Amino acid sequence: MSTAREQPIFSTRAHVFQIDPTTKRNWIPAGKHALTVSYFYDATRNVYRIISIGGAKAIINSTVTPNMTFTKTSQKFGQWADSRANTVYGLGFASEQQLTQFAEKFQEVKEAARLAREKSQDGGEFTSTGLALASHQVPPSPLVSTNGPGEEKLFRSQSADTPGPTERERLKKMLSEGSVGEVQWEAEFFALQDSNQRLAGALREANAAATQWRQQLEVQRAEAELLRQRVAELEAQVAVEPVRAGEKEATSQSVEQLEARVQTKDQTLKNQSTGTREAPDTAEREETQQQVQDLETRNAELEQQLRSMECNLEEARAERERARAEVGRAAQLLDVRLFELSELREGLARLAEAAP
């Protein structure tokens, strides 16, 4: 077997239909999904075929003859009649471009089949030097590779493809009676089914992503609100610190005044002890000393409180800076989430508009 017979000249995907053999009016789909439809060159028999396989079954096995005509019945649907198979095939494509490519390749193969028949009738050897078909997968093989006794058999086989006048009229009537509107609807229906399944999957994924992003957005908003409250508390604490500093200054001044008073008393006592005057007032001196001790204790306590407040103030300032940084990061993340949510909404809107 020739390798050219096993390799397609051109391949595409389409929804395959056959005319109802009973009514000759309705189309019967070959399946729910698009199938691969290919042009093949059979070098052994020197013929071109259109073949489509569904599972283990050949859905289309049509030999292209010069008498065949491929008819576009809509922007995405085309059909041709095969008199040898006694049926009409229909193909529904996903786009008009694919239909045009298939129709152009049909004309090329049809012309190549005509030239092959003419050469075989003349008894000459024919090669495909000037008539090589453009292949999407492999280079085409020669149109005719046999000579001699096999030509008579080839001539008889291809001549049998030519329909008689009665058969031609019957095929014309079959095509005219075919429901073009139903054909278009069938092809569009299967194409739209595939498209809708893809869109539905994309919408489900987008909705799931949107729900997740909304949840993350709510969490970020809650964290941002907590950080704002923490910053407000720290600012309130910082506002109280200057008042405590003023209280310390007043206490320090009182301590200084009392220390000066104690020094004055000590000097007076010293003067009295060196003179011949009366003994000092012991009760007043003890009272003054007790006041000095109390003031010194109070001063030490205030200094300890001041150091503690200064440490707290530094910690509060550092905490406030950290909180501000956290608020800034949260605000940036919130902006990013809002932007992503906006893009998601636009994408969903485009998908909804594109959906039929």
Curated annotation (Swiss-Prot):
Pfam families per record: WH1 (PF00568)
Parts of the chain that traverse the membrane: none
Cellular component terms (Gene Ontology): basal part of cell; cytosol; glutamatergic synapse; postsynaptic density
Keyword Coiled coil: yes
Expression sites by tissue: Expressed in the cerebellum, hippocampus, lung and thymus.
Required for interaction with NFATC2: annotated segments: 1-80
Keywords: Coiled coil, Cytoplasm, Phosphoprotein, Synapse
GO biological process, one term: G protein-coupled glutamate receptor signaling pathway
Positions bearing Phosphoserine: S120, S159
Top-level taxonomic group: Eukaryota
UniProt xrefs under PROSITE patterns: WH1
Region of interest: Disordered: 136-169, 244-295
Coiled coil: 94-122, 191-353
Disulfide bonds: none
Assigned protein family: Belongs to the Homer family.
Quaternary structure and interacting proteins, as annotated: Tetramer. Isoform 1 and isoform 2 encode coiled-coil structures that mediate homo- and heteromultimerization. Interacts with NFATC2; interaction is calcium independent; interaction competes with PPP3CA for NFATC2 binding; interaction is reduced by AKT activation. Interacts with NFATC1 and NFATC4. Interacts with SHANK1; forms a high-order complex at least composed of SHANK1 and HOMER3; the complex formation is regulated by CAMK2A-mediated phosphorylation.
Name of the molecule in the record: Homer protein homolog 3
Species: Mus musculus
Phylogenetic classification of the source organism: Eukaryota, Metazoa, Chordata, Craniata, Vertebrata
